[in-house]
């Protein structure tokens, strides 16, 4: 199974492909989709959509695992992250890729067994689980890989959106 993990954001959307081969996990394509801060929001969202659409067509993941929005104090930040997340979901839907959503708590519990784990602990576990030489950078890419690993582990109550293909 090929899992595309997504850490949505307007400035930086992290993505990471994790392939499940029996009980082993292997890292595939990963990186970040970047958008210029001074660019119009609609153009930034279109760029995220276009790049993610290209990645899905090239990598052909079996599923997309994406971070659920969590409580954010800053309403403006919540709105822009929600918009970026929306275009990620649209891209998956357009490509008939099943979507699974995970909260940050589920990701932390899946990788460390502790729901209040620090970001550095998550990154170290991504490195260890995927047998990487270094901690993946930037953080958004590491987070996307962590979300994909969470799906591979089958952690928590994954919420799949109903699809009829």
Language model feature labels by segment:
Residues 1-165:
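Phosphate- and other anionic-substrate recognition elements at nucleic-acid/protein interfaces
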């Amino acid at each position: 199974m090929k899992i595309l993990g997504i850490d949505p954001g307007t400035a930086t959307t992290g993505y990471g492909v994790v392939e499940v081969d029996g009980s082993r996990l292997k890292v595939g394509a990963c990186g970040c989709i970047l958008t210029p801060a001074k660019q119009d929001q609609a153009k930034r969202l279109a760029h995220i959509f276009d790049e993610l659409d290209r990645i899905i067509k090239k990598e052909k993941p079996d599923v997309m695992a994406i971070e659920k929005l969590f409580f954010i104090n800053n309403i403006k930040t919540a709105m822009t992250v929600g918009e970026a997340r929306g275009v990620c979901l649209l891209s998956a839907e357009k490509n008939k890729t099943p979507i699974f959503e995970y909260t940050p708590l589920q990701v932390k519990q899946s990788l460390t067994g502790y729901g209040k784990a620090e970001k550095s602990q998550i990154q170290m576990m991504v490195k260890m689980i995927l047998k990487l030489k270094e901690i993946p950078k930037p953080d958004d890419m590491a987070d996307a890989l962590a979300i994909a690993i969470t799906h591979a582990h089958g952690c928590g109550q994954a919420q799949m959106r109903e699809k009829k293909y």
